[in-house]
Amino acid sequence: MNGFPMAILLVMPVLLAASASALPDKVSTTAIPDLSGVRAVAISGDASSINITTRSDQPYGASLSGRRKGWFSSWYSSWYFADCRDNSNMRVDGTVLHIDIAASSWLDPSDCVIEVNANVPAGAALRIDQSAFTARLDGHFSDLAIAGKAADVTFDGHASGIDIRADAVRASLDFDRVEADERVSIRARALDAYLGFGDSVPIDYRVTAKASWVDARQPSVPGAMPRVEIDGDFVRVRIR
């Protein structure tokens, strides 16, 4: 009889773990189906994972979803089914898509990842102002304005203007074409960046930093476009 309670104690954690793993992390989604009239996107608030495209062969729309991750997430999903995205919202005001990210309560024992996915018409302007985020931007935009404390940005496409302001930045900016009107400005305390414009493209670039490592295939050409200005404390940048 004495061994029975001990067996219960040994088996219960296994059963709880199995039941937890059998249930998926809680996912909640809000969607706006038609963004054909949108000309700008403004994302603000708390941290999120962002994916924005400008594909004409797919419907224009946006979704905002929350997913619980981290080692507490499976246990939380077993006991509760609360929405981790309760305070975030998304709306269209005229031609602007506004997305405001609000984190779940600090009492929430799990890690809630807010995911933003949108496909908007080419030529739209994009502004991101968040404390921390990762962003995958694939397409043709008019301008990109990014501000925050920590930013991880991957860009593949074209934008006439890119402005990034953050304490810590990791950026990969790969232009698929050059129209000789591009301006890139990055200010960060710590920066690790790659900028690709293509082979044999004259670039006017300036890097100002306390400590820097700059790898460029060709010297700066004053007055040329694209124009790149980088200011920071600790900078590592490759320019191609």
Protein language model features and the residues they cover:
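Fold-core signature of tandem repeat domains
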Residues: 135, 153, 171-173, 193
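Acidic (Asp/Glu) and glycine-rich low-complexity loops/linkers
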Residues: 18-129, 138, 145, 156, ...
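Bacterial N-terminal signal peptides
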Residues: 7-17
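N-terminal secretory signal peptides that target proteins for export/translocation
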Residues: 1-2
